[in-house]
């Protein structure tokens, strides 16, 4: 059991460090961002809010204004290659890119994921830090599970969450709040697939109709 835990931790840390190394120096001066008071999380209207819980004020369209804050952490909840068929709903199973400064922490490594669209199918179903039971409670699979989660999502920081379409980010916020995090410090920024800002780090390139991933 301890060996499995070490492997799981190593996988998460390797993805975080390996993918985002070198992307933590932001272009321009973001010092003023730290001094600004953040608006409280507010759910968007319509399907973006009702289904995904994407924030009304801090989302794909505005996140550039809130990057580089020393009082915040930035987490992208996607997998490098998701077993789910996200192409079936207009997305990308591969991590085709990310917003500069966001660290990749795949939700399916943290807890089991259910309720995905039928066309997408199943995502990763291996070992996880937590298991969500039939009652919606998150049960730690290891003694160290909570300690690891608190290291990834510091409770004294604002937490900005993103993913491909907004679903994994919303599920992550639900999990954290259920486990004792302050919901007023967690923002579901929404969908990378809808992001058109100035801090996009491209991983996917299409050449002569073929997709390539750096």
Which residues make up each language-model segment?
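Rhodanese-like catalytic fold shared by cysteine-dependent sulfurtransferases
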Residues: 2-57, 68-69, 80-214
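Compositionally biased, charge-rich low-complexity tracts
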Residues: 63-64
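Structural scaffold elements adjacent to functional motifs in cytosolic proteins
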Residues: 74-76
């Amino acid at each position: 059991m301890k060996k499995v835990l070490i492997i799981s931790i190593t996988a998460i840390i390797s993805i975080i460090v390996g993918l985002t190394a070198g992307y933590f120096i932001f272009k321009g001066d973001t010092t003023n961002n730290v001094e600004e008071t953040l608006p409280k999380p507010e759910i968007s209207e319509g399907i973006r809010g009702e289904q995904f819980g994407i924030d009304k004020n801090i989302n794909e369209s505005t996140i550039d204004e809130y990057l580089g804050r020393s009082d915040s952490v930035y987490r992208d909840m996607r997998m490098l290659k998701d077993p789910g068929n996200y192409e079936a709903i207009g997305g990308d199973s591969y991590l085709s890119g990310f917003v500069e400064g966001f660290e990749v922490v795949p939700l399916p490594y943290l807890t089991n994921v259910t309720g995905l669209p039928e066309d997408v199918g199943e995502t990763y179903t291996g070992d996880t830090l937590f298991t969500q039971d039939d009652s919606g409670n998150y049960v730690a699979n290891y003694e160290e599970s909570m300690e690891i989660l608190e290291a990834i999502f510091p409770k004294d920081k604002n937490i900005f969450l993103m993913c491909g379409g907004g679903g994994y980010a919303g599920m992550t916020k639900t999990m954290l709040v259920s486990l004792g995090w302050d919901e007023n410090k967690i923002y579901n920024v929404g969908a990378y697939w809808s992001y058109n800002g100035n801090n996009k780090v491209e991983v996917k390139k299409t050449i002569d109709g073929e997709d390539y991933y750096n």
